[in-house]
Regions:
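Surface-exposed, charge/polar-rich loops and edge strands
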Residues: 1-225
């Protein structure tokens, strides 16, 4: 689909805001309402780009976040721009026939520092966060294979995590050595330092299917199902 308009002073996002309709999950069984622009949104959302809110995060109020902070629990915010594929039902008989859309992510350097401080153990809020965090491991693996990789080279393909050689613990083997989560995150931090960047921008098509070995996420807070 190709979009064009004749007023360069108007951004595409402004056009979408003016004539578009906020997509809401089909299971709500109703039309979009004007109030959805504020209520169908997490309290910590900051960057426009997703076609849908990460619904697990809707249960976190400012008070809940304050209570988490009061208990000394480290928390970090990551960005994954949820794509239209989130509304795409699985129609194929086998999971191999389902194609994931590419989604763009942004992760701050301090998030890598926090992960390393906690030995790369994390509780993810929603599968959106899971896809982001687990993609980081495989991006770090790419840097273990090629330290000179460019930003576009870090993209994680849908079945890449399953096609790479793994040891019995599920760690990817590069050469004759298994890459731990801490090493993968360390590679990403070093790459950011070398590039003099504070934020990693990349993309992923990762799919979490039966048989997947989690590298960073060991707990998941998900939405009501």
């Amino acid at each position: 689909v190709d979009f064009s308009w004749d007023d360069d002073s108007v951004a595409f996002a402004e056009i979408l805001d003016a004539i578009g309709e906020l997509p809401i999950p089909p299971y709500l069984n109703r039309e979009t309402e004007e109030t959805d622009k504020t209520t169908y949104q997490t309290v910590y959302s900051k960057i426009k780009g997703s076609v849908a809110a990460p619904t697990a995060g809707l249960h976190f109020t400012q008070k809940v976040l304050a209570d988490i902070d009061a208990h000394g629990i480290d928390r970090e915010e990551v960005t994954l721009h949820v794509g239209a594929g989130t509304f795409k039902p699985v129609k194929s008989e086998e999971i191999e026939g389902h194609a994931m859309h590419t989604e763009y992510i942004a992760v701050r350097r301090q998030t890598f520092e926090k992960l390393l401080a906690h030995e790369c153990h994390a509780t993810a809020v929603g599968t959106t966060s899971v896809r982001t965090l687990e993609s980081l491991y495989y991006m770090g693996v790419k840097l273990a294979m090629n330290p000179d990789a460019q930003e576009e080279d870090l993209h994680v393909n849908q079945w890449e995590p399953y096609d790479l050689p793994h040891n019995e613990e599920g760690l990817v083997i590069v050469g004759d050595k298994a890459v731990t989560a801490a090493e993968a995150i360390g590679h990403l931090r070093h790459w950011l330092d070398a590039a003099k960047l504070d934020v990693l921008h990349s993309s992923t098509q990762i799919i979490i299917a039966p048989g997947y070995t989690y590298q960073i996420v060991d707990k998941l807070i998900t939405n009501f199902h």
